[in-house]
């Protein structure tokens, strides 16, 4: 019999923060090896990290420091992209906002995403960035959910795989909540079912979302 989950909103913990960090160090070693001939240097030629907000902020903060442990200099940039609303499934529409991104022409770019699910968001992000003609562009995802694909896409680097369930924690959210949870957990269906009904009730009553 499995022990009870320590989170009352989750059915189980898939990966603890410590387990993720161990896996991230393994990925960082691979990245350091793969870019060893790219002459990466602070200021002159850092690896440009493009973090996809909002979900990747926790992952990015940890990953760039771990990359630093392996001698990989980085510059961090952010863009906003989303294909989820209040639901647990992608709505299929991708909104990418990359205003203010540095000039990546001729630079080595590594896109960091919290979760690779349908692949619609990451495909749109990569295609958008390629227009700026970087020297190279690769993707690193904290969580890969292969069962959720709507289009073919393979990330060059993956920290952990999960089954086709809805997960939160370590920056991953459900309707902007649960990002602060340190571990990656499976959200109880009762949570999003109840909240979905509440949103419908408020909509019908003409109430603003709190």
Swiss-Prot record:
Any one Gene Ontology molecular-function term assigned to this protein's record: magnesium ion binding
UniProt pathway annotation: Purine metabolism; IMP biosynthesis via salvage pathway; IMP from hypoxanthine: step 1/1
Entry EC no(s): 2.4.2.8
Gene Ontology biological process terms, A to Z: GMP salvage; guanine salvage; hypoxanthine metabolic process; IMP salvage; purine ribonucleoside salvage
Subcellular compartments: Cytoplasm
InterPro entries for this protein: HGPRT, Hxn_phspho_trans, PRibTrfase_dom, PRTase-like
UniProt keyword annotations, A-Z: Cytoplasm, Glycosyltransferase, Magnesium, Metal-binding, Nucleotide-binding, Purine salvage, Transferase
Cofactor: Mg(2+)
Bound cofactor: record note: Binds 2 magnesium ions per subunit. The magnesium ions are essentially bound to the substrate and have few direct interactions with the protein.
Active site: residue positions: 117
Ligand binding (GMP): 54, 113-121, 145, 173
NCBIfam families in alphabetical order: HGPRTase
PANTHER family cross-referenced by the UniProt entry: HYPOXANTHINE PHOSPHORIBOSYLTRANSFERASE, HYPOXANTHINE-GUANINE PHOSPHORIBOSYLTRANSFERASE
Function: Converts guanine to guanosine monophosphate, and hypoxanthine to inosine monophosphate. Transfers the 5-phosphoribosyl group from 5-phosphoribosylpyrophosphate onto the purine. Plays a central role in the generation of purine nucleotides through the purine salvage pathway.
Protein name (database record): Hypoxanthine-guanine phosphoribosyltransferase
Organism: Trypanosoma brucei brucei
Taxon lineage: Eukaryota, Discoba, Euglenozoa, Kinetoplastea, Metakinetoplastina
Gene name for this UniProt entry: HGPRT
